[in-house]
Each structure stands twice: as C-alpha cells, then as structure tokens.
Amino acid sequence: MSSKEIVSNRKALRNYEVLDTVDAGVVLTGTEIKSLRDHGGNLGDAYVTISKGEAWLLNASIAPYRFGNIYNHEERRKRKLLLHRYEIQKLESKVSQKGITIIPLGMFLSRGYVKIRLGCCRGKKAHDKRQTIIAREKQREVESAMKRYR
C-alpha cells in the first residue's frame, strides 16, 4: 500500500498543534483529479465543517486543469469527504470542544484514489511557535554533536 503525497499544508503545521489525525476520501471530478496529479492544489486556507452528518472540505483550491475544456471545475467549490459515520461523530465531538478545529494537513494518492489527511488542531500562540523553534534548534545541535563524535 504505497501512498504518494501530492499536496501538503505546511502552514497548518506551523500555526496549529495537531492533536489527532484521520484519513478520508474526497469526492472529486475528473479534471480535479488530473489537476491534483499535476500538483495543482493548495490547502492554505482550507478547513472542514460537519453539517447534517456529512463532512465538507471548504476553501481548498484546486487549479483548473490546463487541458480542460468548458466543463472544467470550479476552483474553490465545496467538496464532500468520505468518512464512516463513527469517524464523523468522533470528529464532531472533538470540534465541540473550545478552540479545536479540523484542518486538512495534506492530500495523497493511495491505490489511485485521492485521500486527504485531516487533523484535529488547536491554534498555537506566538510563544508556542517560539518554543517549537527553540526545541528544533536544540535537536539539530544535539544531532550535529552526535555526528561529530562518532
């Protein structure tokens, strides 16, 4: 079961603390699939809402397919996510907590189908971001010291 990442949301990892992840399928049209295979997607401002027992991806931008004709897709349309009922209920219970939201972390191909990795996230404050940077720099120093003294 190989999976190939085609779109990632690096902004989400910087601005949010990821608490839990889940993979979901996405209902797409043919030109959207072709555009995503050509790396024509952006998840920068995207988020997920749950309404009437269904999960929807909003604000995700998939560029129009360059070889498409008049039947090309809309760039920022609402896209339905394919999840089991218990997964939707689990996400809904987490989102009901204060400060938790569902953010798409990336899209990947799995067995020819486009899947999306969703994360239950909490927003980071400025001091949290600084602490993350400091921890990453310390880890880098430790790794370089270990490499030097091998």
From Swiss-Prot:
Domain of life: Bacteria
Principal subcellular localisation of the protein: cytoplasm
GO BP terms, alphabetized: trans-translation
Keyword tags: Cytoplasm, RNA-binding
Alphabetized Gene3D superfamilies for the sequence: 2.40.280.10
GO function terms (MF aspect): RNA binding
Pfam families: SmpB
Annotated signal peptide: none
One CC-aspect GO term: cytosol
InterPro entries for this protein: SmpB, SsrA-bd_prot, SsrA-bd_prot_CS
Cellular localization per UniProt: Cytoplasm
UniProt keyword Transferase present: no
HAMAP family recorded: SmpB
Family: Belongs to the SmpB family.
Function comment: Required for rescue of stalled ribosomes mediated by trans-translation. Binds to transfer-messenger RNA (tmRNA), required for stable association of tmRNA with ribosomes. tmRNA and SmpB together mimic tRNA shape, replacing the anticodon stem-loop with SmpB. tmRNA is encoded by the ssrA gene; the 2 termini fold to resemble tRNA(Ala) and it encodes a 'tag peptide', a short internal open reading frame. During trans-translation Ala-aminoacylated tmRNA acts like a tRNA, entering the A-site of stalled ribosomes, displacing the stalled mRNA.
Protein name (Swiss-Prot/TrEMBL): SsrA-binding protein
Source species of the chain: Chlamydia felis (strain Fe/C-56) (Chlamydophila felis)
The encoding gene: smpB
